[in-house]
Amino acid sequence: MGRSGKLPSGVSAKLKRWKKGHSSDSNPATCRHRQAARSRFFSRPSGKSDLTVDAVKLHNELQSGTLSLGKSQAPETTMDQDPEVAFTEKSSGTFLSGLSDCTNVTFSKVQRFWESNSAAHKEICAVLAAVTEVIRSQGGKETETEYFAALMTTMEAVESPESLAAVAYLLNLVLKRVPSPVLMKKFSDTSKAFMDIMSAQASSGSTSALRWVLSCLAILLRKQDLEAWGYPITLQVYHGLLSFTVHAKPKIRKAAQHGVCSVLKGSDFMFGEKAPAHHPAAVSTAKFCIQEIEKSGGSKEATTTLHMLTLLKDMLPCFPEGLVKSCSETLLRVMTLNHVLVTACAMQAFHNLFHAKPSPSTLSAELNAQIVTALYDYVPSENDLQPLLAWLKVMEKAHINLVRLQRDLGLGHLARFFGTAVTCLLSPHSQVAAAATQTLKEILKECVAPHIADIGSVTSSASGPPQYITKMFRAVEEGLTYKFHAAWSSVLQLLGVFFEACGKQAHPVMKKCLQSLCDLRLSPHFPHTAALDQAVGAAVTSMGPEVVLQAVPLEIDGSEETLDFPRSWLLPVIRDHVRETRLGFFTTYFLPLATTLKRKAMDLAQAGSTVESKIYDTLQWQIWTLLPGFCTRPTDVAASFKGLARTLGTAINERPDLRVTVCQALRTLITKGCEAEADRAEVSRFAKNFLPILFNLYGQPVAAGEAAAPRRAVLETIKTYLTITEAQLVNSFLEKATEKVLDPASSDFTRLSVLDLVVALAPYSDEAAISKLYSTIRPYLESKVHGVQKKAYRVLEEVCASSQGPAARFVQSHLDDLKKTLLDSLRTTSSPAKRPRLKCLIHIVKTLSAEHEEFIAALIPEVILCTKEVSVGARKSAFTLLVEMGHAFLRFGSNQEDALQRYLVLIYPGLLGAVTTVSCSILALTHLLFEFKGLMGTSTVEQLLENVCLLLASRTRDVVKSALGFIKVAVVVMDVVHLAKHVQLVMEAIGKLSDDMRRHFRMKLRNLFIKFTRKFGFELVKGLLPAEYHKVLINIRKAETRAKKHRALSQAAVEEEEEEEEEEEPVQSKGDSIEEILADSEDEDEEEERGRGKEQRKLARQRSRAWLKEGGGDEPLNFLDPKVAHRVLATQPGPGRGKKRDHGFKLSADGRLIIREEEDGNKVEEEDGTKGEDEDMTDAMEDASVRSKKKLKRQREDEEDELEIPPRYQAGGSGIHRPVAKKAAPGAEYKAKKAKGDVKKKGRLDPYAYVPLNRSKLNRRKKVKLQGQFKGLVKATQRGSQAGHKLRRKDRRRP
């Protein structure tokens, strides 16, 4: 233990020491902040000023007028001079007056720089301010042209690099907005000034000025017309810009390359009506690139070559065909250097060329095909991961573009590529197999699928494109051989896409593959059954089940000797994938088979073979489950349905086990198979047969123990069939149903069932039938039987819900009668009927006009009371109706605020009624405040809040609960300024709550306090509440502090992980659209500055990194072999190189991440305290009334658990408050109490020390600590093992 007062070793060097005699000084040596403060109080700063001699000189010259703007400018660039003498002058001005009040929007970005500490930004601000003052002093209007003239004059006068950079930056901004005629007229003088600066600054140490001058020159060239490019001076200036694309400094080089791209792609005349196919400077640009590459192509580092390849990557699609060919030949030549980076850049250039999809004048089909053929000589090794991935991507884009240009030629090349790409599935790298699979999928979708219909039938003996398709399929089919067994999952995915793309036309050549797949599925322990089922399913979808079953018969006919059924797995596959096929095939093939199997099952059941009978019964049921798929967009409804209809009717009527399936098939056929008028008419013709059967089934009572699902399916089928049934037939059914309802002999169940049918029939009847129906059900609206009354209101609801047709016309013509009926039946409405009744009123209120305001006013008391109904549906409907009434009042009046106030006045009397009425009225006002928060006046909301605060003094819990809900919504809705006036009132009202109320609503009060403390601070809320609330407030502050700290730690952990993974993140590709090229973003500087160091480190690692793959056996490597380039690897060969990082997510078979969402995202947000305003208001509304009680209880329990605090003080910290809890050693729970060693305990795992798999331990810093702990754990185990071994040896030695 060290001596008292002695610092730990290594600390003394870090501390600042006092000089002798200054140990009592308390003021710091530096006073930077004090000086900054003094400068704000009109005193001169004592420190070094940023004002330079050049800035003073420039300011003096501008003020003295020696840099006049009109001497050498054209008339259109001069400023208008006011001949009259000005009799007013500016009373006061500062150094930056011209900046702060600059009226030109071009420099709005610069106005943000004045607060910056950067010297460059301050220089820009100073120059802009000076130039603006000069323009104003000469009577200018601060146009872009005037700024251009002033800045050009200033550029010739400045001397320091900082001022030159500032002027160039401002010119870069203003040049984009200067009219093109001005720039064309002043091209000679302006370009000469730029070229002089470029030549002077070319070897300068500073890069800023040169970068912005290069950007200005590019903008100037872009604005020239086509005629100007015919002059030698224009090309000479352009070549000056082009020469900087190989500059040694990256920022300058990048600015020049960006400028060249913007000139070739974005010149103004390239977007005109008579735009040339290629820019006039494209030829010289291509020749320059080729010349530079050939000049430096043989050097070791190939730096210039890389620079030119970077430029070519963007420029290649802009060249004419001849130059594209020359450039491509140059690219292919430099790829023979086997330089890793050069090859990668060349591949990027080819990728961009094909991805741009240029016109045939740039890339013809023949040249595209020649490049594709040449790239086969540069296939990387299968062990070379990144180059092989790049090669596959380039070939994918090349073939897609080739097929776009010439279909037959492209398909001819695809056959060879498929053979090469399939061999990539043998690569030891899973990424290569996944990339090859994805590449072939894209080619099938982009190149084959769109053209397969034009190609026609594909057979083995065909020639031309069908032959190419056959070769491609054979290459993929070869993947089913055993040598590809590790990649069978990828092969099956490819086969599925192939079936989907070409199955309809190419099924003759695919039948053998289907047989192979079925045989493969029967092989023992086959691991990819799901992928195989998907592939066969794709074949079923595209070819149809008829073709698939011809290739692989089902082999089930009811006469089997064994019960193996090896191909029964086809039935679920067909069920899940069959669609758009012949419905007649089900009638002719599957229906007889199902009948045979059912008869076989019945025979076996009679013979006592129960198990065999069940198997055949299951098979026939599986066959029937295929029917909904066959009814999904069938191709022969008109021809086949009549042969199937009788069987379906019989099955519905006599086969309860098939009822749900057949009803589903009918619904699917009507909704998805009757789009054609002929098909619709054919199915509608059988409505008179199906609907009576369905009516009868629905009218039958459910037997004890049976499920209600078949009955619901029957009713849904009735509703669906009625959509295509003729109105005359519907009227006849409705008349019969009405008679059944009125029949005194009908039982209650029958009457309720028939009323359900009437509900379904009503919307499809004509107006006369609906009128008659209304007269029939009107007495039932006041029925004593609650179920009948509810059904009657349901009928009325369906009629009122129709927005058009006979039902809508009936509502309009009988509106007064409906209003009277609904008002008269108000007192006799039972609780179960409230929901349909309220829905009727919702539909009616939507159609009302201003003269019906009294009707709405009469409904309000009932609707308010319904907000406390037992049924959640009734409560929701009541709130919806309240909102609709509000919208109705808004329709009635011109002034929305007054109209809403008139509506609220009708609700206010409820606040003076009985307890239930008061509670319901507060709930209604809460909901209206939430819905119409933007339309209610501030005074209205404040008045409501004051009245609700008075109601907090109520002794009834319901009233207090509703009042607290209102306050919670008001806190979220109201502006903080207006809410602040009433904080004291709210807090006083809450403070006067009784102990019982405070205890009962503790969680609601806690939530309110949290919201108030977040808005107004802890001290204010604490000062307004009595002492008994202070403990709760302190707990809230602690919980908020903990939550904030937890969020900060989580954020820090995330940032730390991102920093560690930064090096492995892929570089985001820059956009290559013309808009992005022309947007000269200043943000690129900072990004480039950050990324440059990382890129240099990466280049240093990758430069000259290559490996040679030795020859087989003892044979030496032959360097004269033309294919020796394939043995130059960019990746170190051999497995096990490097470690795979675990990113916390599972990977699928093709390498994609499997990310599962959290089960309850809202709960996470609540724990973090980051809920938005919308979520707060929604929670407040749900908390007010609409949520179910079970959900509220569960949330309350969660909140109480979350907000629970430790009951007593726990030691911690440092010194005497060090942590007292000892950390349990791994495996301590298995240690024996009396003897040595471990013991196995009941209900636990074996006695080992288990190391938890914690993802956070993958952190580089924490990993070392874990390794040390693990080593200690292993050593302890070894010591225990040795001790046990010695004891056993002693025991053996004893006699």
Swiss-Prot record:
This is RRP12-like protein. Residues 1285-1295 have a biased composition (Basic residues). Residues 1054-1066, 1074-1088, 1173-1182 have a biased composition (Acidic residues). It comes from the Eukaryota. Residues 1089-1098, 1153-1172, 1230-1240 have a biased composition (Basic and acidic residues). There is a cross-link at K71 (Glycyl lysine isopeptide (Lys-Gly) (interchain with G-Cter in SUMO1)). One of its GO terms (cellular component) is plasma membrane. The chain crosses the membrane at residues 904-924.
